[in-house]
Amino acid sequence: MGGILALKKDDCHAAPTHLLAEDGSYNTTFLQKYLPQTKIDLICVAGRQQGVVSRTGLALAELPGRAFVNRQRGSGTRMLLDFELKKAGIDPGSIPGYEREVTTHIAVALAVKSGEAEAGLCVYSAAKALNLPFVPVSQERYEIAIRHEHAGDPRVRALISAIRSARFREILENLGGYDTTETGTLREVR
C-alpha cells in the first residue's frame, strides 16, 4: 500500500504492487481508488507463489492453534492472508501470533527456521532459500505501477527493459515460485 500512496503524492515514478481486492482482482481496484484521475501503466513482473512456510508442511487449514508470524498490516501478503482466511472461514483470533508482524518474506521464513514460529505466509523463494517446506496458497500478480506521465523517463524505460529481458526471466525462474508467462506485459489503468 505504501507504494501506491507514494505514487499518489508523486514521490516516485514507479512502485511495486501486489494488492488483492475483495473481489479477487489485483492492483487495479486500489489504483482506481487512490489515484482516480491519474493514468497508470502496470507492467507485470511475474505471477508469484505465496504459501504457508513451516518446518512440518502445514497447510492454511492447520493454522488455528499454531504459533504464527505475520507480515505487517497493509502489505500485499497480509491482505492475501486475510482474504484466504476469510474464504476458508478461519478466525484470525484462533491463530496465536497473528498480531506478530515482520516486514519481509525472508523474516517470516527465518522466524519459522529458528523456531520462533511454527508457520507464516511468504513467497516460495524465501522458503526455498532456507530449505523449508512450503504449501502453496495462491498465486498473486506482482506488478510495477508507473505514473503514465513518467513512462518516457530514461530510468523508467531502463526498468521496463530490464523486466522484459531474458536474463530477468531466467533469474526469476531460478529463484522458483515465479510464473514468467506474462512478465513484461503492460496494461493501463484509468
Please give the residue ranges for each predicted region.
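Short beta-strand-centered segments that line the small-molecule binding cleft or hinge
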Residues: 3-48
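A ligand-binding cleft/hinge motif common to bilobed small-molecule-binding domains
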Residues: 18-33, 109-138
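Periplasmic-binding protein-like
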Residues: 39-51, 132-161, 163-188
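Flexible hinge/capping segments at coil-to-helix
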Residues: 45-69
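Short loop->beta-strand "edge-of-pocket" segments that line small-molecule binding or catalytic clefts
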Residues: 60-84
